[in-house]
Curated annotation (Swiss-Prot):
Entry superkingdom: Bacteria
Subunit (UniProt): May form a heterooligomeric complex that consists of seven subunits: mnhA2, mnhB2, mnhC2, mnhD2, mnhE2, mnhF2 and mnhG2.
Predominant place of localization: membrane
Keyword Oxidoreductase (UniProt): no
One example GO MF annotation: NADH dehydrogenase (ubiquinone) activity
Annotated organism of origin: Staphylococcus aureus (strain NCTC 8325 / PS 47)
Membrane topology of this protein: Multi-pass membrane protein
Name by which UniProt lists this protein: Putative antiporter subunit mnhD2
Compartments reported by the entry: Cell membrane
GO biological process, one term: ATP synthesis coupled electron transport
Keyword Aminoacyl-tRNA synthetase assigned: no
Keyword list, A-Z: Antiport, Cell membrane, Ion transport, Membrane, Transmembrane, Transmembrane helix, Transport
GO CC, alphabetical: plasma membrane
Length: 498
């Protein structure tokens, strides 16, 4: 009976999205329906996560067809902590949108498309079937295509074209990889694939397939293939930029972690050094971007790229500590990047400018923004006891164990550069004076302060409750790095199957 609840985090937003299509002229009902739906989704996800931590992973086989023949959803520590975190930030993002009137009269059916994107994101985390992962990716991407093209500026349309083209190429590669892998192993269920690939051992065809998946997921995670991200994020409104920054690249990073710990772990000698190299390149590119621009929205976009480099560096170490740190940092970064884009969007709203020179001592007039920005900087920089610290320490440890001293050095340097770029903004927030010009600051709406306060509290709480979160991420790491344990807990009936 409990396993049936596993469908609800995806089903509830889907049903809500359909209902909202017919409520385009009733803002009040739409608001309460959405917020209620996502709040319930978050609570259910958290309850399932607590159960899994105390007992064992949950599986749901649709239509009574057991794996590997039927569609299977898996609720383990990794998938459920991602679903819980994603549901929580989606709730805040939509509350932000309703607060600023973006959803008034259900404009462009915006809430529905955000919910459809949420369905794809949550489904990607829960599915234990390769083809259904592709389906969830496509649901997510189709909704994101609509969201990124909502606007009338030429700049936004140009960014949308780049985003759409690169993601379509990534989807083609993903589908190609699925076809080749099915031809090779004859199954699409994750645990069954892992078992058959282990039986095959080292194989050139499998190596080629793993490289195809690596490129496909790298495009979605902005790992080296980042060209779409800065332009796309810079032209989106605050709500959508926060949504994309918090979730879109993280789904790609999640797929990389799931695939290259559980499925293709027998190709460690090739894939993991390649992942570490790509992570290093991504960190360097991100670091160059954050110091090259004065546009605070582009600085925020390149911060996303740096964080992806950190996460994949942990995966590339191929150590328990490094992978554990990557998962912890992945979860933390969803919340931190939501906070970053909310703050940046609010600064643009208040001043009317995207350049940090025009902040003109804003933090003196609005201390909350100064405090929130400082906490966010420390979380991004991994300063103890803030939320970024445990993940970075574990990634450092993994890099040391792996002997990847270059990656370790680059992570330290790029962390300092990331903090420097944000401290530069903070300086103008306290001491800025754009040639003595007067900047008329808009009054900050109360709902922005409330949402920022919630996110700041959560960021602090993650740092304080790090042992609790690490217990979850450690279980996730253990399950996904042990094929036998995964097989035993998820699909024990497949044991010994030809």
């Amino acid at each position: 009976m409990l396993s049936n609840l596993l469908i609800l985090p995806m089903l509830l937003p889907f049903l809500c999205a359909l209902i909202l299509v017919f409520l385009k002229n009733n803002d009040r009902i739409s608001k309460y329906l959405y917020l209620g739906t996502m709040t319930i989704t978050t609570i259910i996800s958290l309850m399932l996560l607590i159960y899994v931590q105390r007992h064992r992973p949950i599986t749901l086989d649709f239509g009574g067809w057991s794996a590997p023949f039927g569609i299977q959803f898996l609720g383990d520590s990794l998938s459920l902590i991602m679903v819980t975190t994603a549901s929580f930030v989606i709730t805040l993002i939509m509350a932000y949108g309703f607060g600023r009137g973006e959803h008034k009269a259900n404009r462009y059916h915006l809430p529905s498309f955000i919910l459809f994107l949420s369905v794809g994101v949550i489904g990607s985390f829960l599915t234990s079937d390769l083809f259904n992962l592709y389906v969830m990716f496509e649901i997510m991407l189709l909704a994101s295509f609509v969201l990124i093209t909502l606007g009338q500026s030429v700049e936004q349309l140009r960014a949308a074209i780049i985003y759409v083209v690169l993601n379509i190429i990534g989807s083609w590669l993903f589908l190609l990889g699925i076809g080749l892998l099915y031809k090779t192993v004859g199954t699409l269920n994750f645990s069954h694939i892992a078992m058959r690939l282990n039986d095959m051992g080292d194989n050139r065809t499998v190596t080629m397939i793993s490289l195809i998946f690596l490129v496909a997921f790298s495009a979605k995670a902005a790992l080296v293939l980042f060209m779409w991200l800065p332009k796309a994020y810079a032209v989106l409104n605050t709500e959508l930029a926060a949504l994309f920054a918090a979730l879109m690249t993280k789904v790609g990073a999640y797929a990389l972690i799931r695939f290259f710990t559980l499925l293709f772990d027998q190709h460690n000698d090739l894939i993991h050094p390649l992942l570490a190299t790509m992570a290093a390149i991504t960190m360097v590119i991100g670091a160059i971007g954050v110091i090259a621009y004065k546009d605070i929205k582009k600085i925020a976009a390149y911060q996303v790229i740096i964080s992806i480099g950190f996460i994949i560096l942990g995966l590339g170490t191929n150590t328990f500590a490094g992978i554990n740190g990557a998962i912890f940092y992945l979860v933390n970064d969803i919340v931190v990047k939501t906070l970053l884009f909310f703050i940046i969007g609010s600064l643009v709203y208040i001043t009317g400018y995207r350049q940090y020179q025009y902040l003109n001592g804003l933090a003196k007039k609005e201390p909350l923004f100064g405090v929130a920005f400082i906490i966010m900087i420390f979380a991004i920089g991994g300063v103890p006891p803030f939320s970024g610290f445990p993940g970075k320490v574990l990634i450092f440890q993994g890099a040391l164990q792996n002997g990847n001293y270059i990656g370790l050095a680059l992570m330290i340097i790029t962390s300092l550069i990331a903090m420097y770029s944000l401290f530069r903004i903070l300086f103008y927030m306290y001491f800025g004076d754009k040639d003595g010009e007067e900047v008329n600051f808009k009054k900050i709406p109360l709902y922005r302060k409330r949402i920022l306060s919630i996110l700041v509290v959560v960021v602090i709480a993650i740092g304080i409750a790090a042992p609790v979160v690490l217990n979850v991420t450690s279980d996730a790491t253990e399950l996904n790095t042990s094929d036998q344990l995964y097989q035993k807990l998820v699909n024990p009936h497949l044991k010994g199957e030809d």
